[in-house]
């Protein structure tokens, strides 16, 4: 089999490339996906409110696990990644957050990455998006990804939580993806007008899969990339339960879009990576590239949970006897509790003035439950998901064998810097201040977690060690740049090789301030133009907020806990 391009991974970026490259009818593309189809009849992936279900099994989730994390009481921690058409956009929380403009401007400070500034990237965010309330300088109106904005009146807890943030002295913003990210406001979500998950399989592949120049293979586990000297010329994969590899050749390029965990694994199995690591497994060295699998980053978060005195939380929706009605409303009308992910309000703040842009993120949820659906509190409650955004901690992904089915060694080194501990202590204390503002007085009951007895630095630190969890945002393991630990250049081309690019969240040099899916899609759109040799979209002239040393709180708190 011969194709112009072979794309490995039908995830948030791979589906973008498959769709954009096959817009040219003379370009042939093979799209390989280790998982299965995105079954539209499966409520677990299609109903926004069911977002916890895919993380509880292995049909749609690689269900990776870390090595014992040395600064987290040696816990082995979850590292869920999407498996199936749509990749992690098939199982994520559907929060559409692009990050802060200064994240991208920071990338663009690196020599060779100048065209990755916010104003260079904003046109590609807009190209990907159709926002339900209409387009403007920051949002698109004709893109493949449906973005829904929270509407007033959905749940009184959302507006109360936003108002509490304002009463605590922080700004209010009407658009976390617009002019000003800093502050509290409604959260955009990748949900269709019909109340369905807007994965990249739905948004992109639905328009491309019938094209004769696109071939899609599911249940295709990539074994390795084939090289002729220093040029990538094809891919070998295993289909289903077969142990006999299937092979295809690429006339132009192999495009690796398997994500921050799988992309470095595939490179390492293919002979690209740290020479000493590859020698351990007798893998013939194609190119010594020590940065492959290094620079692993993530967002860590905690839940601060409170009893809700008014019966307005989602607790009744967790009771089995209410779920048939919820399911029917969603299935036949695309409405009701099932049609939202319920992350409809959130915010970004600076915990200290030393940070030039927000370093703490909030997701508000009108129920007290773990992200993966476990440990639901058996009463009306609500919670804040809160965590730091740009931890200096770095980890790695390294293969354990040549077997493509064996999970790699994953170590994030969570909380390995003093900055991490200071940020999380600040986050807990600031959150308590926010939760005790007048806007929440009629709803807020007792603090369920951590509990009011948890006060000292030592007690807060122990709570973090035992209870902080991943936000499922790994990135950085094939970082873009030109230093000795970089893996790809500013166009995603792997250093020292030909015919091979990496296009996914693994190329982010530094993690962004927010959820990763929107920016991963943007990377796919921007790289698609580079691969096709098209001129970049015109640079945006939209303005954006920069704090420039402004106080972190715009005004004095309505109520001071001290």
Swiss-Prot record:
Task: Please name the PROSITE patterns in this protein's record.
Answer: GMC_OXRED_1, GMC_OXRED_2
Lipid bilayer topology: Peripheral membrane protein
- Cellular component terms, GO, for this chain's entry? plasma membrane
Q: Which gene underlies this protein?
A: betA
Read off the NCBIfam families from this record: betA, PRK02106.1
Q: What is this protein called?
A: Oxygen-dependent choline dehydrogenase
Keyword Transit peptide set for record? no
Its UniProt pathway annotation is: Amine and polyamine biosynthesis; betaine biosynthesis via choline pathway; betaine aldehyde from choline (cytochrome c reductase route): step 1/1
Q: Report the top EC class in one word.
A: oxidoreductase
**For binding FAD, which residues are annotated in this chain's numbering?**
4-33
Q: Which reaction does it catalyse?
A: choline + A = betaine aldehyde + AH2; betaine aldehyde + NAD(+) + H2O = glycine betaine + NADH + 2 H(+)
According to its UniProt entry, this protein's organism is Escherichia coli O157:H7
Assigned EC number: 1.1.99.1, 1.2.1.8
Family assignment from sequence similarity = Belongs to the GMC oxidoreductase family.
